[in-house]
């Protein structure tokens, strides 16, 4: 080393010590000498100046197709932009040559630190633009080699080169150019076979359904070349995918068969019990698994006692779900097998008898045997005049609606009129009913024509014989022919908010 170079190094070190110690005069002196000698220098702030604690950096990443995503990186303010590029390369696979960093609205250079760009606190932001690799010389082998070199540098191994495994190939002499041989150059190498990822431009193998780098789906228009032969690695991957698909289909089939068997077993049960803790919406009892009943039609859950009480107190052949709140009344019905499983044999028989009685009373073509306390009845047709009761075996006349086995119809009618003239009690009863009908204190049922009257309360009543719901104020049926809820007929009370009559006192 000559004297001039040695002197320049001493003056540079003296300048560094003077700046560090805050000696302005000495720093000016040394800097002036170095400037006069035109000594080339590189001035760089030591890492100790920047904070060393880790911070969270918010990075907005955008590619050539204007796709944007936000990621968070754990960095130190004293890191250089080059180190930041290496971090992104190792973590996300984007080579440093494709990264353009913008920090504080300024293009960052590799040797600059994050601290110099104002990155000092958690939540500070930066912008990363990813260049397209379409026009670069990157290929999968070069990309893998760069990643391995970066990993070796992180481990402290520098100035290394990666050698391929296996026996060394003999060094071939350099081929002569066409100027030396007088022949044209060989044809350029054919482009690699595969499809190019529209996101990161990586060339993937033809059979791969998604990008190996960014997992983006293969373009739908791409067709695998007919002459393409997969290599060993691809064949292994395809075999693994086929095996995974086979196992998936097998598990799916097993699950379907299990679900089917579960449904079959559930269908064979009369009652569906709850599998999770539930609360009865009627009595608010907390029910453990297996203590409540889930109705098949509407899936509402109740305790057994509340359902049994609902069935016993029902006046209809079809028992409605008892669920009701301020906004909703469930229209679901209990199934016959659910009712049979909930009730005792005696209660179930009474329920069946109620259904038969309702069916009889609501039919205009039904006739009940006139024998006292006899349960026999029938549906009659126009061409049938007599009914032999299967219970008491008495013969009923369907024309006279009576039993007169030793008289014909004319004789029975004459005898009935004669007895009515001499029966004072019958005459008084007939007169009382006529007066009540005239004064509006009683009315004929619009279905079965018996006399009904209202004791007190609202204007809704139910016929005790045919169970027809009646609107007292309009003297007609409450609902249409479809039954409860059918507003196509009946009094149509509260349809569009309009009462059925100015004097209506709520007919439900």
UniProtKB/Swiss-Prot annotation:
Free-text domain note: The RanBP2-type zinc finger, also called Npl4 zinc finger (NZF), mediates binding to 'Met-1'-linked polyubiquitins.
Region named Interaction with TAB2: 1-268
Reaction(s) the record says it catalyses: [E2 ubiquitin-conjugating enzyme]-S-ubiquitinyl-L-cysteine + [acceptor protein]-L-lysine = [E2 ubiquitin-conjugating enzyme]-L-cysteine + [acceptor protein]-N(6)-ubiquitinyl-L-lysine
Region entry Interaction with IRF3, spans: 1-218
Subunit comment: Component of the LUBAC complex (linear ubiquitin chain assembly complex) which consists of SHARPIN, RBCK1 and RNF31. LUBAC has a MW of approximately 600 kDa suggesting a heteromultimeric assembly of its subunits. Interacts with beta-I-type (PRKCB1) and zeta-type protein kinase C (PRKCZ). Interacts with UBE2L3. Interacts with IREB2 only in iron-rich conditions. Associates with the TNF-R1 signaling complex (TNF-RSC) in a stimulation-dependent manner. Interacts with EYA1, TAB2, TAB3, MAP3K7 TRAF6 and RIPK1. Interacts with IRF3.
Zinc finger (RanBP2-type): 188-220
Active site feature: 458
PTM annotation, UniProt: Auto-ubiquitinated. Auto-ubiquitination leads to degradation by the proteasome. Phosphorylated. In vitro, phosphorylation inhibits auto-ubiquitination activity.
Classification of source organism: Eukaryota, Metazoa, Chordata, Craniata, Vertebrata
Binding site for Zn(2+) 3: 369, 374, 389, 392
Pathway where it operates: Protein modification; protein ubiquitination
Enzyme Commission identifier(s): 2.3.2.31
PTM sites of type N-acetylmethionine: 1
InterPro entries assigned: BRcat_RBR_HOIL1 (IPR047558), HOIL1_RBR_mRING-HC-C3HC3D (IPR047559), LUBAC_E3_Ligases (IPR051628), Rcat_RBR_HOIL1 (IPR047557), TRIAD_supradom (IPR044066), Ubiquitin-like_dom (IPR000626), Ubiquitin-like_domsf (IPR029071), Znf-RING_euk (IPR027370)
Residues modified as Phosphotyrosine: 328
Protein name as it appears in the record: RanBP-type and C3HC4-type zinc finger-containing protein 1
Chain residues that bind Zn(2+) 5: 445, 448, 463, 466
UniProt zinc finger (IBR-type) residues: 349-409
């Amino acid at each position: 080393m000559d004297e001039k170079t040695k002197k320049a190094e001493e003056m540079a070190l003296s300048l560094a010590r003077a700046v560090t110690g805050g000696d302005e005069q000495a720093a000016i002196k040394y800097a002036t000498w170095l400037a006069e000698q035109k000594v080339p220098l590189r001035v760089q702030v030591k890492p100790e100046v920047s904070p060393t604690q880790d911070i969270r950096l918010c990075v907005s990443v955008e590619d050539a197709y204007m796709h944007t995503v936000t990621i968070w990186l754990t960095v130190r303010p004293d890191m250089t932009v080059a180190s930041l590029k290496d971090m992104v390369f190792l973590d996300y696979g984007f080579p440093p040559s494709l990264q353009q960093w913008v920090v504080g609205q300024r293009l960052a250079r590799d040797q600059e630190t994050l601290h110099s760009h104002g990155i000092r606190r958690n939540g500070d932001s930066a912008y990363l633009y990813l260049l397209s690799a379409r026009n670069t010389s990157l290929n999968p082998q070069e990309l893998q080699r760069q990643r391995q070199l970066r990993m070796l540098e992180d481990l402290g191994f520098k100035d290394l080169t990666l050698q391929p495994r296996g026996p060394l190939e003999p060094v071939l002499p350099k081929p002569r150019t066409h100027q030396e041989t007088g022949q044209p150059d060989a044809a350029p190498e054919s482009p690699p076979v595969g499809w190019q990822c529209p996101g990161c431009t990586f060339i993937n193998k033809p059979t791969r359904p998604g990008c190996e780098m960014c997992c983006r789906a293969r373009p739908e228009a791409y067709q695998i070349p007919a002459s393409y032969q997969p290599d060993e690695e691809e064949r292994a991957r395809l075999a693994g995918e086929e095996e995974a698909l086979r196992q998936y289909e097998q598990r799916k089939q097993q699950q379907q068969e299990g679900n089917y068997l579960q449904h079959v077993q559930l269908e064979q049960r009369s009652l569906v019990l709850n599998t999770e803790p539930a609360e009865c919406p009627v009595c608010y009892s907390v029910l453990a698994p297996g203590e409540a009943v889930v109705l098949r039609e509407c899936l509402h859950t109740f305790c057994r006692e509340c359902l049994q009480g609902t069935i016993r107190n029902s006046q209809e052949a079809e028992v409605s779900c008892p669920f009701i709140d301020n906004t909703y009344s469930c229209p679901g019905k209990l199934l016959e097998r659910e009712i049979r499983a909930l009730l005792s044999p005696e209660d179930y028989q009474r329920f069946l008898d109620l259904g038969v009685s309702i069916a009889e009373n609501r039919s205009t073509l039904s006739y009940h045997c006139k024998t006292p306390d006899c349960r026999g009845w029938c549906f009659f047709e126009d061409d049938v005049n007599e009914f032999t009761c299967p219970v008491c075996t008495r013969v009923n006349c369907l024309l006279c609606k009576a039993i007169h086995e030793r008289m014909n119809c004319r004789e029975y009618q004459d005898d009935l009129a004669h007895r009515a003239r001499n029966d004072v009690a019958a005459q008084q009863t007939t007169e009382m009913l006529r007066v009540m009908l005239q004064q509006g204190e009683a009315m004929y049922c619009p279905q079965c024509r018996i006399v009904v009257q209202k004791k007190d309360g609202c204007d809704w009543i139910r016929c005790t014989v045919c169970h027809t719901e009646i609107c007292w104020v309009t003297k007609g049926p409450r609902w249409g022919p479809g039954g409860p809820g059918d507003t196509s007929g009946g009094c149509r009370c509260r349809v569009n908010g309009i009462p059925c009559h100015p004097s209506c006192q709520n007919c439900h």
